[in-house]
Amino acid sequence: MEKKQLKFIDLFAGIGGMRIPFEELGGKCVFSSEIDKHCQRTYEANFGEMPTGDITKLSADSIPYHDLLLAGFPCQAFSQGGRKQGFQDERGQLFFQVAKILNDHRPQAILLENVKGLRGHDKGRTLQMILYVLEKLNYVVSWKIISATDFNLPQKRERIFIVGFQDKNNKNLIFDFPKPIELTAKVGDLLEKEVDEKYTITDRMWEGHQNRKKAHRKRGNGFGFSLVNRNSSYTRTISARYYKDGSEVLVEQANKNPRVLTPRECARLQGFPESFVIPVSDCQAWRQFGNSVPVSVIRAIAQKMLSYIDLTEQQKEFKKVDLDQVITQKKKQLYPEDYQEQFIQKELALL
């Protein structure tokens, strides 16, 4: 049977960091979704299409056939920098929108990305819920925490990657994640040679950074700015709040205050190509690259995933599951005390 072109969809697409490697490898994006208007602008500037907006308003028939689903579902609900509310946060609930699309379409493969904090969030119960739902949708799932430094990007950025394949004939296929490669790139390789003076921080800002770092050190945490130079092996994680939370990566400069990274340098630290267009303000660009994925890591995973996907296969009939029932069953197992309290309240109401 003739091999067909890989078709994939790009959900919570951001600025397309997950899309780039799969297109490089011959895949075709047949649908994209991103609600942020500034990200939409960057996405359109680079891929020539405006992503669909609110994923919660999508109908099953509005999404075309696809072999692969990509989703970097919102991480703020699980991250160290956020409030860590998980599924109690509306953004955490958006994973279930992904599950709904999987239930409607059952693509052969999935690739999900989130912050490292997802692993231990709510004592591991959040990840347990995600894996349980995917398994009930007949996916054999593997996950791993990978740093951008593992694939030659000089940024210490650890993220969790969840890969799943439809379980055919109960083979229980286990995905073999790509092996790390040697970090040969240095921060200096990615820094611009000439930088506008506007990126140098003021005396007041520099004093504020130093005072905040001292305060964080007294409290025993690792927040606060970090200084790098051209010889540094890597930077810390660039965050979506790069321009306002005091945890900036700052670049040393001779005989003057340090400077912030330029948007192009942030793009390079995330592995975006030089041809990638940045049509938005610096503040929006910092936010977008801070929220994005390390493209080199996605590329390595994509190369592995393609060897597991059968592009000669025709989609088979499948039976949809009752997602509400699946989720409720797992919640009862993970949070028995909550359901016991609800039962008591119902009994008291009958008295």
Curated annotation (Swiss-Prot):
Gene Ontology terms for molecular function: DNA (cytosine-5-)-methyltransferase activity; DNA binding
Active site, per annotation: 75
Example GO biological process: DNA restriction-modification system
EC id: 2.1.1.37
Domain SAM-dependent MTase C5-type: 6-312
Major enzyme class: transferase
Keywords: DNA-binding, Methyltransferase, Restriction system, S-adenosyl-L-methionine, Transferase
Reaction catalysed by this enzyme: a 2'-deoxycytidine in DNA + S-adenosyl-L-methionine = a 5-methyl-2'-deoxycytidine in DNA + S-adenosyl-L-homocysteine + H(+)
Cross-referenced CDD domains: Cyt_C5_DNA_methylase
InterPro entries: C5-MTase (IPR050750), C5_DNA_meth_AS (IPR018117), C5_MeTfrase (IPR001525), C5_meth_CS (IPR031303), SAM-dependent_MTases_sf (IPR029063)
Residues annotated as signal peptide: none
Family: Belongs to the class I-like SAM-binding methyltransferase superfamily. C5-methyltransferase family.
Matching NCBIfam families: dcm
Name of protein: Type II methyltransferase M.DsaV
Organism the protein comes from: Dactylococcopsis salina (Myxobaktron salinum)
